[in-house]
Design a protein with these regions (language model features):
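Active-site charged/polar residues at nucleotide-handling catalytic sites that mediate phosphoryl
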Residues: 44-45, 100, 306
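Nucleotide-sugar donor-binding catalytic core of glycosyltransferases
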Residues: 1-41, 45, 54-66, 104-242, ...
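C-terminal alpha-helical cap of glycosyltransferases
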Residues: 308-326
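A short, well-ordered alpha-helix in the C-terminal region of glycosyltransferases
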Residues: 291-305
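Membrane-proximal helix-turn-helix segments that form the acceptor-binding/catalytic region
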Residues: 89-104, 175
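Active-site proximal beta-strand in glycosyltransferases
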Residues: 71-84
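Conserved acidic donor-binding segment of nucleotide-sugar-dependent glycosyltransferases
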Residues: 269-275, 284-289
Length: 326
């Protein structure tokens, strides 16, 4: 089966498409889209199905209309994987779906399945995962060596727009107590120098390292003693949860129902439900090398049930069941 992904963003093209390859499909990734690019790919690659994903430079209004027109003219099924739910369902995902008019939608948010169904949109749940060819345990790298690391964007403007967002609570539980107690945390990602209006703390400039290439993240996960995993929702996991564990990192994350549903705290990762508990856990595990190593190993084993190959196989099963594929 030939699958065409109309996408260019590193956080999207190095995950699910590789899972379909691992599942035995022939996969092509478009790169930046134009009418010429899409027309050429459809005629030369001759895909059986076309995927679009997430929120990127390839999901602008203009490109969404172009994708819809081109794929429908080729009489091919168009699938959209919604990775911005539930936060941006109304501001981004639904308007995009209305322009793309996909034949089927997968969403990372279970609670949105019923909502989309009531709107007449064919939909199923499909979570993030990780690709073991991208997120794997590497040798520690001196450039990224640190006691406590965070790989994430801060999103200060979005969080000021959504002051009740669970991500803020996660940040206040995991990061604020450490910074307030001058316990160094090394940050990779954008916007950490602008987070003070949201969290009420200023992160010291030497702790902030800026943008990190997506495919280099596992070097941090393999080199930091503790990785802080920020959660966006109570009922779903962030993408980096899977990626940190897949890279053999020692993960300290927020104590949420979904974390507990999928993993065993204290065995495969550790969780905190308060700033005080975060301080206690960090102080304990920074001294407990053997415990950290054991938990990391169990975590890497547990997360192997969440590879993108397995996600791809399940997507194909659903699409066949829904008669999108034959």
């Amino acid at each position: 089966m030939r699958i065409l992904f109309l996408e260019s963003h590193p956080m999207l093209i190095y995950g699910l498409p590789g899972g379909f390859r691992d599942a035995g499909c022939e996969v092509k990734i478009s790169g930046p889209l134009s009418l010429e690019t899409i027309t050429t790919l459809l005629s030369e690659f001759r895909p059986d199905i076309v995927f679009t994903m997430g929120w990127s430079n390839e999901t602008t209004d203009k490109k969404a209309h172009l994708i819809h027109k081109s794929v429908k003219a080729a009489k091919l099924p168009l699938i959209y994987w919604a990775t911005e739910d539930p936060t941006h369902t109304h501001s981004f995902t639904l308007p995009l779906i209305q322009k793309l008019k996909p034949d089927f939608v997968f969403t990372i948010c279970r609670e949105r399945v019923g909502y989309y169904s009531k709107l007449g949109i064919r939909v199923a749940h499909m979570d993030f995962g990780y690709h073991p060819g991208i997120h794997f345990k590497s040798d520690p790298n001196a450039r990224y060596s640190c006691e406590i690391g965070v790989v994430a964007n801060a999103y200060p403007r979005i969080l000021q727009k959504y002051p009740q967002h669970h991500r803020i609570e996660s940040l206040k539980t995991l990061i604020v107590p450490l910074v307030k107690n001058n316990i160094r945390v090394d940050f990779w990602g954008k916007g950490w120098d602008e987070i003070e209006p949201v969290l009420g703390i200023k992160i010291p400039e030497p702790w902030i390292h800026g943008y990190l290439e997506y495919c280099d993240a596992n070097l941090v996960y393999s080199s930091a003693s503790i990785l802080l995993g920020i959660q966006n929702q109570l009922t779903q996991l962030s993408q980096r949860t899977y990626e940190i564990m897949g890279s053999g990192g020692f993960l300290l994350t927020s104590d949420t129902p979904e974390v507990r549903r999928l993993f065993s705290p204290g065995r495969e990762l550790v969780v905190s439900s308060s700033p005080e508990q975060t301080l206690e856990l960090v102080r304990h595990y920074l001294k407990a090398d053997a415990e950290r190593q054991q938990i990391s190993q169990w975590g890497q084993k547990a997360v192997s049930a969440h590879t993108y190959q397995l996600r791809a196989i399940e997507m194909l099963r659903i699409l066949k069941e829904e008669k999108i594929l034959h």
